């Protein structure tokens, strides 16, 4: 399987589990699929995927992935510029960023739900369940690569440990909340 995936740890983890990860920009995915240069692809979520036209070639959609479970908007500002801002301006940026994130997540949930419905009802796309063994295999491969990176880079190890500590706290709650929320529909 030749699969368009991001480079770095993500692509390396796919390679570890026997998937030939191919890195390419978004605009190259559909032509690569049409020419048979790749067999499958990931990009984002139903709405952007449908805008790119993947449904013209791909008819099986797997929503549940691991390497990117959320999409968040990013805002970058030069550190010197940020430092030159007043406390009020910094607070205004913080409030605007938080409001934007909240609105963005609500918007994405709605537009992606509508796009998934359109893909399945109007374009012959079949929504598939990701095989359970994918999750354990991918996570084992990713963990191996992350442990190797942590052994080579002290700062990476510190950040990764912080992320694991955070996950130990939030994952049990969030997984449980999402399971119960899913049962409402």
Regions found by a protein language model. Name each.
Residues 1-185:
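N-terminal secretory/targeting leader peptides
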């Amino acid at each position: 399987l030749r699969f368009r995936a991001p480079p770095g740890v993500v692509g390396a983890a796919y390679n570890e589990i026997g998937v030939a990860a191919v890195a390419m920009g978004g605009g190259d995915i559909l032509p690569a699929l049409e020419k048979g240069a790749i067999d499958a692809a990931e990009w984002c979520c139903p709405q952007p995927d449908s805008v790119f036209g993947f449904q013209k070639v791909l008819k099986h959609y797997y929503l549940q992935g691991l390497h990117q479970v959320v999409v968040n908007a990013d805002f970058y500002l030069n550190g010197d510029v940020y430092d030159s801002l007043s406390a009020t301006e910094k607070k205004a940026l913080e409030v605007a960023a938080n409001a934007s994130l909240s609105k963005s997540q609500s918007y994405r949930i709605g537009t992606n739900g509508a796009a998934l419905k359109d893909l399945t009802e109007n374009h012959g796309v079949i929504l598939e369940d990701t095989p359970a063994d994918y999750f354990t295999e991918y996570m084992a491969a990713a963990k191996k690569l992350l442990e190797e990176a942590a052994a080579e880079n002290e700062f990476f190890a510190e950040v990764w440990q912080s992320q694991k500590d955070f996950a130990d706290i939030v994952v049990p709650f969030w997984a449980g909340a999402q399971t119960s929320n899913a049962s409402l529909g």
